[in-house]
Amino acid sequence: MVSIMNKNELITEILKNEVVKALGCTEVGLIGYTVAKAKPEDLYSIKEIKLILDKGTFKNAFSVGVPNTNKFGILPAVVGGLLGREENKLEVFKDIKYDEKLEEFIENKLKIEVIDSDVYCKVIIKANKVYEAETKGSHSGKSLSDDLKNAYKSLTLKDFIDYIEDIPEEVIKIIKETIETNKNLSTPEVPEDFISLDLKDEILNHMLKKTVSAVYNRMIGINKPAMAIAGSGNMGLTATLPIIAYDEIKGHDEEKLTKSITLSALTTIYSAYHSSYISAMCGCVNRGGIGAVSGLSYYIFGFDRIEESIKSFTANLPGIVCDGGKIGCALKIASGVFAIYLSLFSKVPYTNGIVGKDFKECIENIGKIGKAMKPVDDEIIEILKNKK
């Protein structure tokens, strides 16, 4: 077991690495960043660009908006990477001015290979010579060791609860940045030509509008960053904005909000580590939802109902599939917010389906289902490849 001091140091290190800023969908950011690392000085000397992508990166970049391009998908992500700066990493599209001529020049030179791997992007550019770059293990290429991740997986809900009672100042700064950054992606309303939301329940209505609008804005490629959690911006939005919305309705309590968001981030990461970063199971709803349920339950009831709320959530939405990053993700997140809200006020016994006897077993069971869905993921990839 990790000692008390080491537990807190471990948790802090995990949070510092897994709660990071990203502009646009993290998968197009990954592609753009890797292209920026590989690009030649003379872009018009390029003869071929080959991308080797893991299935999840291909899937999530396929239909999603790319910031500062007014376009969707992998091609503009590549062009954006050619125009962007490597030092901006996952914010590689920041300040770019899109070039339609460059897109026309590149379009027929782009080849894509999809492989079965964890997070992976390799770029091979043939120009006056061959330029190569790869990013693997995480979207920024900065990957935590398996030992650290396994140590984190051995922690308990009580460890997380103990941690949020005395959060280090460096983590408080990250959490405050997360709150402000993710709030900034929300708009008062969601476009009516996409979805009409006007519920009588004031709390649920505000939670839905705040969360769904932010995810929608991110998926169309709005030029504003999100704080990603465990490699996903949408997961970060789902894990934080329902709690922020509740806090706004009930009257702002900064200390309680900071603790709740921290707990949400901790349980979201914990859930991600018990599954795989990208799979056929929608991580935004399942992992981000677990986080939001944990944080909201703490905010409303204290520590007493967290485990029961997670059991109720486990009985509801796990299994919802991920068919890539796109504006439709906002609809799945809407379903997730409903499930999060229901979980706070319901109780489901351990005898029901995949519901675990405690926090840890619930998350382990959800992770097992996600890992077993590989054939589903393969079929989704084939459907996308065959789209014209």
Curated annotation (Swiss-Prot):
Enzyme nomenclature, EC number: 4.4.1.28
Residue positions of the active site: 25 (proton acceptor)
Binding residues for [4Fe-4S] cluster: 282, 322, 329
UniProt keyword Lyase, yes or no: yes
Biological role: Catalyzes the cleavage of L-cysteine to form 2-aminoprop-2-enoate and sulfide. The former then spontaneously hydrolyzes to pyruvate and NH(3). May be responsible for the production of sulfide required for the biosynthesis of iron-sulfur centers in this archaea. Is very specific for L-cysteine, with no activity being detected with D-cysteine, L-homocysteine, 3-mercaptopropionate (cysteine without the amino group), cysteamine (cysteine without the carboxylate), or mercaptolactate (the hydroxyl analog of cysteine).
Cofactor-binding details, from the entry: Binds 1 [4Fe-4S] cluster per subunit.
Keywords carried by this UniProt record: 4Fe-4S, Iron, Iron-sulfur, Lyase, Metal-binding
One Pfam family, short name: SDH_alpha
One Gene Ontology biological process: L-cysteine catabolic process to pyruvate
pH effect summary: Optimum pH is 7.6.
Subunit structure: Homotrimer.
Top-rank taxon: Archaea
Entries under InterPro entries matching the protein: Ser_deHydtase-like_asu (IPR005130), UPF0597 (IPR021144)
Catalyzed reactions per annotation: L-cysteine + H2O = hydrogen sulfide + pyruvate + NH4(+) + H(+)
UniProt key word Lyase: yes
Name of the protein in its database record: L-cysteine desulfidase
Cofactor: [4Fe-4S] cluster
Family: Belongs to the L-cysteine desulfidase family.
GO-annotated molecular function: 4 iron, 4 sulfur cluster binding; L-cysteine desulfhydrase activity; metal ion binding
Enzyme class, first EC level, given as a word: lyase
